[in-house]
Amino acid sequence: MKKYIMALDQGTTSSRAILFDQEGKRVGSSQKEFTQFYPKAGWVEHDPMEIWGTQSGVAREVLETTGISTQDIAAIGITNQRETTIIWDKNTGKPIYNAIVWQCRRTAGICDELKAQGMETYIRENTGLVVDAYFSGTKVKWILDHVEGAREKAENGELLFGTVDSWLIWNLTRGKVHVTDYSNASRTMLYNIKELKWDEKILEALDIPKSMLPEVKASSEVYGHTDHQTFGGADIPIAGAAGDQQAALFGQACFQPGMAKNTYGTGCFMLMNTGEKFVPSENGLLTTLAWGVDGKVEYALEGSIFVAGAAVQWLRDELRIIRDAEDTEYLATKVADSNGVYVVPAFTGMGAPYWDMYARGAILGLTRGAKAEHIIRATLESIAYQTRDVLEAMQEDSGIELRSLKVDGGAVSNNFLMQFQADILGVQVDRPEIIETTALGAAYLAGLAVGFWRDKNEIANKWKVDTVFSPTMENTKKEKMYRGWKRAVNRALKWELEEE
């Protein structure tokens, strides 16, 4: 029997390949960062060829460094940065423009046009999403409108659109397969998550030819096999795909309605499983597809926070008050509190539950006694405050009061942040033994499709807690601090508009 599953984890800043064994333990990994392009203020792009180059490179590298043969790989699972939009030429396989990244705000104007056309309620009710530049739909329109000859080629059926999963599967199979999974499709703002099909009315409003779109498949099924030239002659099933946040929900074994996880990465993303029920949000959350597995499609509520770990990168790269992200834990604990300082990291607007494309970052409450450590501490605290904003909306929408929150992602190794998170939520925070849950979720989805794991019960039994953080902060103090945060956010909202 084959011994391993390979997860390809194509993130916003790096491409990773991780090998997991039958126990769900990591046996090897390889990672490579790639270039971020910022052609104008608020614009973010990647080079699709570099995405593919780094992703295929780390896949080969992890096999070399572990000495594991392609013959021992039972399947490949893919997880990816969602919403990021790639359009390529069907005949040459070459992109016609850079990938427009989920963080990119250039299509805010197209979103305003959709609202002016009265499409907002329709989109909300049928895709589960808000009209925002974050999602793929307006990015596709922008490329078709701005790349010379693109619209004509698209109408002639010569162009293909895909989120990153589609682009990787297309390249792994050398152009034989053009598919996506339910979870990724549900983030395009083009997919009707009630009827489970591409939405003609939205495609028409954005003037996007249906022939460009990938076929939507289950999150756990064999889509195709690696081409012989991709992996030195190997024929490995590509058997699972899910957007990064849905993959993390699966990797955390949140299989029952009401179970939730928060992933702390570049942004922060909290998802709650709502089972086979489309739960509309009245509180600025998204309703999204969690996954399609075992012939069933399940839904989730999601709160997307645009800037979390990215704020720590900003402290390091732009303000240069830390050398690396790990320093923040020590420096934050060198001061007793944030000295009344609040950081609102709205560098690319505010996500859930505010959805304000025109909010901008702010540091408030500064006095002459404010030190670098206070700003560092306030930056970490901002991640926890934003999480509370989302959790309150989620409890309101679902009618479920959360007893504990499962956490994952890079920043969960920061004990200060995790303890403050438990304190400000007033809820137990569970950090699992394996924090690579995004890649693990992709591995589980692929493994289920090829019989490497029996069923979801077997997977649920593998989930083990590493550390439990229990709330210790006194209630009056907690609420006072949170009120201060809400005041700070209100100052940052709609900032850009005030110029006009």
UniProtKB/Swiss-Prot annotation:
It catalyses: glycerol + ATP = sn-glycerol 3-phosphate + ADP + H(+). Pathway: Polyol metabolism; glycerol degradation via glycerol kinase pathway; sn-glycerol 3-phosphate from glycerol: step 1/1. It holds the Pfam family FGGY_N. Sn-glycerol 3-phosphate binds at residues 12, 82-83, 134, 244. Glycerol binds at residues 82-83, 134, 244-245. GO terms for cellular component: cytosol. GO terms for biological process: glycerol catabolic process; glycerol metabolic process; glycerol-3-phosphate metabolic process. Its EC number is 2.7.1.30. GO terms for molecular function: ATP binding; glycerol kinase activity. InterPro entries: ATPase_NBD, Carb_kinase_FGGY, Carb_kinase_FGGY_CS, FGGY_C, FGGY_N, Glycerol_kin. Coiled coil: none annotated. It comes from the Bacteria. It is an enzyme of class 2 (transferase). Keywords: ATP-binding, Glycerol metabolism, Kinase, Nucleotide-binding, Transferase. Activated by phosphorylation and inhibited by fructose 1,6-bisphosphate (FBP). Key enzyme in the regulation of glycerol uptake and metabolism. Catalyzes the phosphorylation of glycerol to yield sn-glycerol 3-phosphate. Belongs to the FGGY kinase family. NCBIfam families: glycerol_kin, PRK00047.1. This is Glycerol kinase. It comes from Alkaliphilus metalliredigens (strain QYMF).
